[in-house]
UniProtKB/Swiss-Prot annotation:
SMART domains tied to this protein: AFOR_N (SM00790)
Source organism of this protein record: Pyrococcus furiosus (strain ATCC 43587 / DSM 3638 / JCM 8422 / Vc1)
MF term (GO), any: metal ion binding
pH-activity note: Optimum pH is above 10.
The protein, known as: Tungsten-containing aldehyde ferredoxin oxidoreductase
Cited function: Aldehyde ferredoxin oxidoreductase with a broad substrate specificity. Catalyzes the oxidation of a range of aliphatic aldehydes to their corresponding carboxylic acids. In vitro can use crotonaldehyde, acetaldehyde, formaldehyde, butyraldehyde or glyceraldehyde as substrate, using methyl viologen or ferredoxin, but not NAD(P), as the electron acceptor. Does not oxidize glucose or glyceraldehyde 3-phosphate. May be involved in a pyroglycolytic pathway.
Gene: aor
Amino acid sequence: MYGNWGRFIRVNLSTGDIKVEEYDEELAKKWLGSRGLAIYLLLKEMDPTVDPLSPENKLIIAAGPLTGTSAPTGGRYNVVTKSPLTGFITMANSGGYFGAELKFAGYDAIVVEGKAEKPVYIYIKDEHIEIRDASHIWGKKVSETEATIRKEVGSEKVKIASIGPAGENLVKFAAIMNDGHRAAGRGGVGAVMGSKNLKAIAVEGSKTVPIADKQKFMLVVREKVNKLRNDPVAGGGLPKYGTAVLVNIINENGLYPVKNFQTGVYPYAYEQSGEAMAAKYLVRNKPCYACPIGCGRVNRLPTVGETEGPEYESVWALGANLGINDLASIIEANHMCDELGLDTISTGGTLATAMELYEKGHIKDEELGDAPPFRWGNTEVLHYYIEKIAKREGFGDKLAEGSYRLAESYGHPELSMTVKKLELPAYDPRGAEGHGLGYATNNRGGCHIKNYMISPEILGYPYKMDPHDVSDDKIKMLILFQDLTALIDSAGLCLFTTFGLGADDYRDLLNAALGWDFTTEDYLKIGERIWNAERLFNLKAGLDPARDDTLPKRFLEEPMPEGPNKGHTVRLKEMLPRYYKLRGWTEDGKIPKEKLEELGIAEFY
């Protein structure tokens, strides 16, 4: 087999058993790898109704067939599990170097089961795999954890994925961090890892990922790298200003969420933009493995020294969404989240919900005691509560449950800007209605990157679409994006490659690496299979389409108050039935057996 090794590690932390298991190429041709392999294993092996924080939940860390190769951005991996935040599937994706190192060790994935009696970490060096005591690093921040493990194993080459105090304390939006500041962030994967008493996974390898036709693959890689470098976004805006280049663009288009999505225009946007960051704090770019784009930032602050990030989503979540415009405070807060192991989007979203609850008089000063009040623009709130959330101290314990449960506890769940209890990212759907449909139908909830309709609706990729068009063509484009991103994730590539590359380009890379002769349609069918399999998992886990495939009332009933999208709401009711029909699902959002048979997954019906 090429690309994939056809091997994964299975670790049962309850028993201490470690196995290396194999799978054949026919399975790879059906699921490709990474995200696809993971959902196959979950459907085959696990009851979707398990408690996400119980030993019965499985945590799957998986790289794709192009991870660890010279394919542009070939450093991505996925963490797939049942989310403690949403109760549904989550697939948290991360870059850096950890995923590539897993492939260099000779494995495609790690399946973690059970729960250790005491804190442990897993150490992998090629064929050597062991479970080690982690009691001495339990409670440590991410940078301390990585430094300690490197010293213990005697290697600077080792790559580490770990949790911070937030994961240990089962914060429902805890992240898994790797390579210091890269995050598998969404859905509480860090809490699942913490529930298993697993502090870290450290891996180093000496192998080379097998390629079917090395000469052809290198020619294809060179061609695709050149396409990316010549693209104005992948080769221009992203390397020059990082993902925060979007701040001004999204704000000018009137969908940059402010104060818990109360409006979509922020007068201080430039002060927290990628341009402002580059001018004031940027030290250098830091690309992930095999990445020709290099959107990663290294900034320097007097308070924390050199630190990576923040990304666009983090700038917004810890900034405009809280009415905060001081960029230094935002960078410092992002650094705190990375060190403590917190998803910045959910952290900011939960604090924004608390601020609106406070603004409307639902959270009282007497509840907070000596803690800072939840006032918009209060940077003291930002730094104080990030620490409290991670440690579940004081009011931070309530915040650690996420914004939906927080708002629900005060009788106002409508003030939580979530889909399926996952906090929404930095695009108000009243300014991009196809993107809003993507939020509502996303398998992991309020997520942008699995259905990035901002590309056609705002940025013009692959071509410009009216953000307020709700036609079948718009819905078909969304479905294509959802299936394509499932494919890209499963291949082990970054979604930023879609700025410059199209479906045919991914076909070329995969065929050259794997030695297959698949058509573009064959690969998109894999993506469709994965999307439907994840939907099936959710339905088995208790998804009610009528209840869960929706948006917060704010977007459906409150017109945008100002800016280019003034007066607009999201016409979800007009789009959702047609989305179901175009997906081949029933009128009530279920997947009929005939569709599963068409996709070759009727065994899971």
